[in-house]
């Protein structure tokens, strides 16, 4: 590592600490004596997404986050939920050990997680990802969500449609 002050290539490590996703090292130049900090992070091997038209594009977590944020915009989700979904998807993709993954696999992973997270975000993402051309396709997705609601809704998730309110109970007056 070259010294940022005198550009000498030698330095000694004074302190080394683990940080969130790597190692922080405090260094001292052996020539000028100036101290500086370096960060080392693991850089996974390149992962490419194969698009529908067979183009290959390097996986970009920021692009994934952007799509997730757009789908979850103005939804009452817990702080960090979108980042966690993106991180989980990224980890799963790298754990597959493949150099290339089809964009359809990535889209299906996003759909699966959004369905568990928030139905509205799921429908928003599905409408773009599945390229709906008319309202009947959207209605079909919503109907599937409503019909399979018992297994699909998780604790804390907002309902897609308002729940039916039970008939008010009749109160009898005492005589």
Curated annotation (Swiss-Prot):
Cofactor: Zn(2+)
Keyword Zinc: yes
ATP-cone domain span: 47-137
Keywords, comma-separated and alphabetical: ATP-binding, DNA-binding, Metal-binding, Nucleotide-binding, Repressor, Transcription, Transcription regulation, Zinc, Zinc-finger
UniProt xrefs under InterPro entries: ATP-cone_dom (IPR005144), NrdR-like_N (IPR055173), RNR_NrdR-like (IPR003796)
Cofactor note: Binds 1 zinc ion.
NCBIfam families from the UniProt entry: transcriptional regulator NrdR
Protein name according to UniProt: Transcriptional repressor NrdR
Annotated source species: Dehalococcoides mccartyi (strain ATCC BAA-2100 / JCM 16839 / KCTC 5957 / BAV1)
Gene expressing this chain: nrdR
């Amino acid at each position: 590592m070259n010294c940022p002050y005198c550009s000498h290539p030698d330095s000694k490590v004074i302190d080394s600490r683990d940080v969130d996703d790597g190692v922080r090292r405090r260094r001292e130049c052996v020539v000028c004596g100036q101290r500086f900090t370096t960060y080392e992070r693991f850089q996974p091997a390149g992962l490419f997404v194969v698009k529908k038209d067979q183009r290959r594009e390097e996986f970009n977590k920021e692009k994934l986050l952007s799509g997730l944020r757009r789908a979850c915009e103005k939804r009452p989700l817990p702080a960090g939920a979108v980042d966690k979904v993106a991180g989980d998807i990224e980890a799963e993709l790298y754990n597959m050990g493949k150099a290339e993954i089809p964009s359809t696999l990535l889209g299906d992973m996003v759909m699966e997680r959004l369905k568990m997270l928030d139905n509205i975000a799921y429908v928003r993402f599905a409408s773009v990802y599945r390229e709906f051309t008319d309202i009947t396709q959207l209605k079909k997705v919503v109907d599937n969500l409503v019909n399979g609601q018992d297994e699909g809704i998780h604790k804390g998730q907002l309902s897609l449609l308002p729940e039916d309110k039970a008939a008010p109970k009749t109160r009898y007056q005492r005589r």
